[in-house]
Amino acid sequence: MISVATAECFTHGKIGTKIHKIACGYKEFEKDSNYDMIHGNVYVMASMFLPSKKGIESLLDVNLPKPDYVFKYSKAYNQENDILVAKLVAKALKNKLNCNIAISSTAGIGNGAVCIVTDYNDYVFSSDIYGDLLKGQNIIKRQESGIEKAYNTFIDILKKEYNLK
C-alpha cells in the first residue's frame, strides 16, 4: 500500500480528503475514473489543514521563513516564497511521517504553490489562477485550480512511479 500525507493551506485539506475518501471506498467517488487505481492501493496517513506558521513549525519540526505579509493568524507569502515554503513543508512532512508521498500547499499573493515529494522525485507547481489572500481576490477559484492540478499530478505519479493502472 502506498502511504500519503498532506499538509495543506490554500487547499484546506481537500486534496487529502478526496484521496482518503476514494481510498476508503466512499460511494460518492465510485464514478471517479481513478477509483479502482486508488481504492485498495493507497491510504492516507494524515490530511491536515495548516494555515499558520506556528502550527506547521510545531507539528513538522521545520523552520519557515518570516511571512512576507501580515494576515490575521495565517502566513502569507509572495509567489517565490510560496514555492520555497511548499517544498519545505512537503519534505518535512515526508521525513516526519515516513510516508511514500507527501503533498503540501500554500498561497498568499500569487498563484500559490503545491509540492509533492515522493520516494523518487519532487514536483512543484502552481495553480492556474492568480489570487490575493489579503484582498480575498480569486481565492476560491485559485483553490479549485490547485486541488485539481494536485489531484491530477498525484494520479500521474501513481501511474509513472508506482506502476498503478
Swiss-Prot record:
Disulfide bonds: none annotated. Transmembrane segments: none annotated. Belongs to the UPF0254 family. This is UPF0254 protein MMP0935. It comes from Methanococcus maripaludis (strain DSM 14266 / JCM 13030 / NBRC 101832 / S2 / LL). The lineage of its organism: Archaea, Methanobacteriati, Methanobacteriota, Methanomada group, Methanococci.
